[in-house]
């Protein structure tokens, strides 16, 4: 998948996960714990996560990923296409483990990010959905996300969707 593509042919998914763990611990990374909402069950087990940030901040937030990728994988992602832009609270990642799917957790996390977008005064919440994931696309459409344009990210054909806040 896209994680292996980002790590490159000579590196493992385990190495990629180590990079991501370092980025999560940083304050100024797009994957920072500060940009992450976590859903847990009554036993404190992670039932889902969503990562979002102001699209206008992508370039500054991505610096840490670029540094880590250069150092760990020897790959320079400086020229990587932006996946978001100014004017949207961008949902970078949404994940719900298989055991917790179908319980409304993704909807709850999406609603929380939509609320965050309102509080920030941004005009929209945006995301990219893989064209090969109709289930996710249906979830977003059911919640009010609208098609904006086609995009390619990480070698995958994507659709850029937005939830209008104005």
Predicted segments, located by residue:
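A short, internal acetyl-CoA/4′-phosphopantetheine-binding micro-motif in the GNAT/acyltransferase core
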Residues: 40, 68-70, 74-75, 94-101, ...
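Conserved acetyl-CoA-binding loop-helix of GNAT-fold acetyltransferases
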Residues: 96, 102-115, 119, 138-142
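Conserved GNAT acetyl-CoA-binding A-motif
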Residues: 87-89, 101, 117-128
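Active-site rim helix/loop that mediates acceptor-substrate recognition in acyltransferases
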Residues: 13-36, 41-42
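Conserved GNAT-fold acetyl-CoA-binding loop/helix
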Residues: 1-24, 70-71
């Amino acid at each position: 998948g896209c994680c292996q593509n980002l790590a490159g042919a000579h590196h493992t998914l385990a190495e990629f996960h180590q990079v991501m763990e370092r980025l999560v611990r940083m304050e100024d990374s797009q994957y920072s714990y500060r940009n992450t909402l976590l859903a847990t069950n009554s036993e404190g087990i992670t039932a889902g996560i969503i990562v979002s940030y102001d699209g206008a901040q992508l370039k500054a937030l991505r610096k840490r990923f670029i540094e880590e990728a250069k150092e760990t994988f020897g790959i320079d992602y400086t020229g990587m296409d932006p996946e978001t832009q100014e004017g949207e609270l961008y949902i970078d990642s949404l994940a719900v483990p298989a055991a917790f799917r179908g319980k409304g957790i993704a909807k709850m996390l999406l609603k929380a990010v939509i609320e965050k977008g309102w509080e920030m005064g941004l005009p929209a919440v945006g995301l990219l959905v893989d064209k090969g994931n109709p289930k996710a696309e249906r979830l977003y459409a059911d919640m009010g996300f609208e098609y904006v344009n086609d995009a390619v990210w990480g070698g995958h054909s994507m659709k850029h969707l937005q939830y209008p806040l104005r």
